[in-house]
UniProtKB/Swiss-Prot annotation:
This is Neurotrophin-3. Residues 67-79 have a biased composition (Basic and acidic residues). Residues 19-139 form a propeptide. Disulfide bonds join C153-C218, C196-C247, C206-C249.
Length: 258
């Protein structure tokens, strides 16, 4: 198409020059050589553009094809921080430093004292060691009696040694590992829980609440801690589970009271 355009354009240019010039005209040889050069230039341009396209296609064909990520098939376990039941090892125990909670303890013996952060709570110890009250707890009890302060609800704290199941942060029922085999002696998992002694410490509900305008009741509250658990007896790992951690007073306004 471009060659035809060049020929028509040159013929038109020659006609104009023939009309405007007297006896002189463009030599026939020079005109033919000009046409030949234009045709050669156009052919060379087309050839170069075709070569560039071929080089680009060859380069793309040599590149490795990117594979799409394979979706796990149904029932296939994806790689995660959880391990199969048969592969539970000391690596999970090393992770306790990262997932450590003061209310969760891995030990080869039953704990006799509350965690350091909860020494000032009303701890219910093991009956065997109930008489071994530490001087620190005795001093705190005496100091508390002189302050004239009372709790709205009465709570008690203790180490739970037989926890077998719990609800995780997704709302799923999971199995709590009671014993973990490591090396020479297995270790057990203990949970320091706090709950209400009774729903109504006084006749009408919580202590110190105006019962003319309010209904009150002591309720155990839960929070999340990290614990070694398994789901469907397959994958073992550290999960967030709910345990009893406090006793609070729940209030509701009495109907007809303002």
């Amino acid at each position: 198409m471009s060659i035809l355009f060049y020929v028509i354009f040159l013929a038109y240019l020659r006609g104009i020059q023939g009309n405007s010039m007297d006896q002189r005209s463009l030599p026939e040889d020079s005109l033919n050589s000009l046409i030949i050069k234009l045709i050669q230039a156009d052919i060379l341009k087309n050839k170069l553009s075709k070569q560039m396209v071929d080089v680009k296609e060859n380069y793309q064909s040599t590149l490795p094809k990117a594979e799409a990520p394979r979706e796990p098939e149904q029932g296939e376990a994806t790689r995660s921080e959880f391990q199969p039941m048969i592969a539970t090892d000391t690596e999970l125990l090393r992770q306790q430093r990262r997932y450590n909670s003061p209310r969760v303890l891995l030990s080869d013996s039953t704990p006799l004292e509350p965690p350091p952060l909860y020494l000032m709570e009303d701890y219910v110890g093991n009956p065997v060691v109930a008489n071994r009250t530490s001087p620190r707890r005795k001093r705190y009890a005496e100091h508390k009696s002189h302050r004239g302060e009372y709790s709205v609800c009465d709570s008690e704290s203790l180490w739970v040694t037989d926890k077998s199941s719990a609800i995780d942060i997704r709302g799923h029922q999971v199995t709590v590992l009671g014993e973990i085999k490591t090396g020479n002696s297995p270790v057990k998992q203990y949970f320091y829980e706090t709950r209400c002694k009774e729903a109504r410490p006084v006749k009408n509900g919580c202590r110190g609440i105006d019962d003319k305008h309010w209904n009150s009741q002591c309720k155990t509250s839960q929070t999340y801690v990290r614990a070694l658990t398994s789901e469907n007896n397959k994958l073992v790992g550290w999960r967030w589970i709910r345990i009893d951690t406090s006793c609070v007073c729940a209030l509701s306004r009495k109907i007809g009271r303002t």
